[in-house]
């Protein structure tokens, strides 16, 4: 693996993720993402879909290790009962909406998700995200949209 991580490449036409269908987020993209948004590094952050730890490695560069919580399949984020100041992740695309809705409830301050802008294509998904009163103003919408 290179410093930039693996590239996102193949399409998966089934609704089940293949075990080999794993793509780490490039370190450089995570750094750019974190630099584009303001975070208080004295507060807690959770990465609930850490995979092999690419985003977590960068989070540990920005935060003290004791403030970073990271897990993957061993804990189901959708059943999470704890709260964190920030949620930062590249969620599984097929359940990204469920991750967003869960993050609205467990992130004390904000959440930041790495998703393609095309994720908002489709009226139903867009309406569900933006009709929520907590996301209806432009500053709150930055919870999950950061232009890179």
Spans of model-derived segments:
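Class I S-adenosyl-L-methionine-dependent methyltransferase catalytic core
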Residues: 1-148
């Amino acid at each position: 693996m290179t410093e930039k991580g693996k590239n996102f490449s193949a399409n998966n036409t089934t609704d089940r993720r293949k075990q080999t269908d794993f793509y780490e987020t490039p370190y450089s993209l995570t750094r750019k993402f974190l630099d584009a948004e303001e975070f208080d590094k004295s507060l807690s952050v959770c990465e609930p879909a850490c995979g092999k730890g690419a985003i977590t490695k960068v989070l540990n560069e920005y935060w003290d290790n004791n403030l970073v919580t990271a897990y993957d399949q061993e804990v189901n984020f959708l059943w999470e009962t704890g709260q964190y100041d920030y949620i930062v992740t590249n969620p599984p695309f097929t359940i990204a909406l469920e991750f967003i809705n869960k993050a609205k409830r467990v992130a004390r301050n904000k959440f930041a998700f790495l998703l393609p802008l095309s994720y908002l294509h489709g009226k139903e998904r867009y309406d569900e995200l933006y009709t929520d009163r907590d996301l209806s103003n432009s500053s709150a919408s930055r919870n999950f949209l950061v232009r890179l």
